[in-house]
Swiss-Prot record:
Its EC number is 7.1.1.-. Belongs to the complex I subunit 2 family. GO terms for biological process: ATP synthesis coupled electron transport; photosynthesis, light reaction. The chain crosses the membrane at residues 15-35, 43-63, 80-100, 110-130, 133-153, 168-188, 211-231, 245-265, 281-301, 307-327, 335-355, 379-399, 401-421, 467-487. InterPro entries: NADH-Q_OxRdtase_suN/2, ND/Mrp_TM, Ndh2_N. PANTHER family: NADH DEHYDROGENASE. One of its GO terms (cellular component) is plasma membrane-derived thylakoid membrane. It comes from Microcystis aeruginosa (strain NIES-843 / IAM M-2473). NDH-1 can be composed of about 15 different subunits; different subcomplexes with different compositions have been identified which probably have different functions. Its main location: membrane. This is NAD(P)H-quinone oxidoreductase subunit 2. The gene is ndhB. It comes from the Bacteria. It catalyses: a plastoquinone + NADH + (n+1) H(+)(in) = a plastoquinol + NAD(+) + n H(+)(out); a plastoquinone + NADPH + (n+1) H(+)(in) = a plastoquinol + NADP(+) + n H(+)(out).
Length: 513
């Protein structure tokens, strides 16, 4: 074997060809904007969407790859990473549809916005499969820095600037905390950076039990908890969600959060397997706090964006039930819930964006009487919100059932009961919005709705944002009907990923003892 063949076999770059498609798409957008100029606005977003969908198709063809390890072990292209990378790519494609009209109305460069968003997507996708410390940190910062830039993209809006500054300061602090935990792992393992090598070295040294390892665990969890908006590392979420451009908020609530959970699974399961009881205990506490605070504080919100911000904190708590279960059913239900959360949450944000573009407000009280002026928007928003609340037979109901059942089977009875109670509480603030939209008395109609312009929902007259809303509605509805195939997909991604099978076996043995 010659040198070039040896290098090619070691790098195995074909594993990341979905990301390669996105890199080419990013270059086309930047060069197209440079050459064509402002007239490129009409086709650049669709190039981005086409590239993202092509990346999802490429991910499909890498399923069950017999050689998933790439770049000398720095990246794992296993089925677990494929599912998370697909979630992130699909969330970005939906967000691009939402962004076109929003960015144009703000008078800022659409090409630059798309370039930053695709960079964040690349960071999230690389983070989902990263299995080496340097790769993890570079991917994490690639995602984080792009998110900071998108948050402050509307530079003429003081709220956007404030949100970006808060996000930057708190995000930089969390990155430093996470990096300190990672540096402890590097030192404890004697200079290893591969996650599997670190796990092996930690096992050889004192059986993995040491004060330094416990400190590293706490710092790493703090960094991950910031990314998934878990209480008490959630302080940035309401202010950043309220002040940021709404399409950016939609991406942060799904794409960024999915990347955070992918990192949590791979890092905690691989490196901290010997202290799995400890990190599960910490995540049980985080889940309880997130579900209670997120859903209770959401009851008092008057802004749709702040309500959805606290809702996303509560939703993160539900997802953590699957993570703490540590079983095949737990991981599968976690992935399944993120798959349907993608559709219902992005659908809700798309409706909020359209209403804000038409009325200039996101206050909940201003939605009063919307059904009389825009029945289809009311229907779409109602279905997405009720699905988030877990109302049967919508997709969110099946997602929560799977999560709660996995937690119950794992013996997490108190956690499941808290989840059930807070889920019931969340239904109130979702139904409150729905009830407000369908009031029939003209005197109860808000001023914003009274002046609501006529919207064309015909097939030929819909704008990209309206297409995104309809697609989200269809996807949310189909996710409820086709919950079994989606759950089978999630289960297959777990049962064919070696690190999760080893972790599930270890968890079963420890509980049996």
């Amino acid at each position: 074997m010659d040198f070039s063949s040896l290098v090619a076999s070691q790098l195995n770059a074909g594993v990341i060809w979905p990301e390669g498609i996105l890199i080419i798409t990013l270059m086309v957008i930047l060069i197209g904007d440079l050459i064509v100029g402002r007239s490129a606005r009409s086709w650049l977003p669709y190039v981005a969407i086409a590239g993202l969908l092509a990346a999802v198709v490429a991910l499909y063809f890498t399923w069950d790859n017999p050689k998933p390890v790439a770049f000398l072990g720095a990246f794992e292209g296993d089925n677990l990473s494929i599912v998370f990378r697909a979630i992130i790519a699909l969330s970005t494609a939906s967000t691009v549809l939402m962004s076109i009209r929003y960015v144009e109305q703000a008078g800022t460069s659409l090409a630059e916005f798309l370039a930053i968003m695709l960079t964040a997507t690349l960071g999230g996708m690389f983070l989902s499969g990263a299995s080496e410390l340097v790769m993890i940190f570079i991917s994490l910062e690639m995602l984080s820095i792009s998110s900071y830039l998108m948050t402050g993209y509307m530079k003429r809006d003081p709220r956007s600037n404030e949100a970006a500054l808060k996000y930057l300061l708190i995000g930089a602090s969390s990155s430093a905390i996470f990096l300190y935990g990672v540096s402890l792992l590097y030192g404890l393992s004697g200079g290893e950076t591969s996650l599997s090598a670190i796990a092996q070295k930690l096992t050889d040294v004192n059986g993995g039990q040491s004060l330094a390892l416990a400190i590293a665990l706490v710092f790493v969890i703090a960094g991950i908890a910031f990314k998934i908006s878990a209480v008490p590392f959630h302080q940035w979420t309401p202010d950043v969600y309220e002040g940021s451009p709404t399409p950016v908020v939609a991406f942060l609530s799904v794409g960024s959060k999915a990347a955070g959970f992918a990192l949590a699974i791979r890092l905690l399961v691989t490196v901290f397997g010997l202290v799995s009881e400890q990190w599960r205990f910490i995540f049980i506490a985080l889940a309880i706090l997130s579900m209670i605070l997120g859903n209770v504080v959401a009851l008092a919100q008057t802004s749709m964006k702040r309500m959805l911000a606290y809702s996303s904190i509560g939703q993160a708590g539900f997802v953590m039930i699957g993570l703490t279960a540590g079983t095949d059913a737990g991981y599968s239900s976690m992935i399944f819930y993120l798959l349907i959360y993608l559709f219902m949450n992005l659908g809700a944000f798309a409706c909020v964006i359209l209403f804000a573009l038409r009325t200039g407000t996101d206050q909940i009280a201003e939605y009063s009487g919307l059904y009389q002026k825009d029945p289809l928007l009311t229907l779409c928003l109602s279905i997405c919100l009720l699905s988030l609340g877990g109302i049967p037979p919508l997709a969110g109901f099946f997602g929560k059932i799977y999560l709660f059942w996995a937690g119950w089977q794992a013996g997490l009875y108190a956690l499941v009961l808290v989840g059930l109670v807070t889920s019931v509480a969340s239904i109130y603030y979702y139904i409150r919005v729905v009830k407000m939209m369908v009031v029939k008395e003209p005197q109860e109609m808000s001023d914003a709705v009274k002046n609501y312009p006529v919207i064309n929902w015909t097939l030929t007259g819909m704008r990209p944002l309206q297409v995104g809303i309809v697609l989200s509605l269809v996807a949310t509805s189909l996710a409820g009907i086709l919950s079994n195939p989606l759950f089978t997909l999630a289960t297959d991604s777990v049962t064919t990923t070696p690190i999760l099978q080893s972790a599930a076996l270890a968890t079963h043995i420890s509980r049996a003892n």
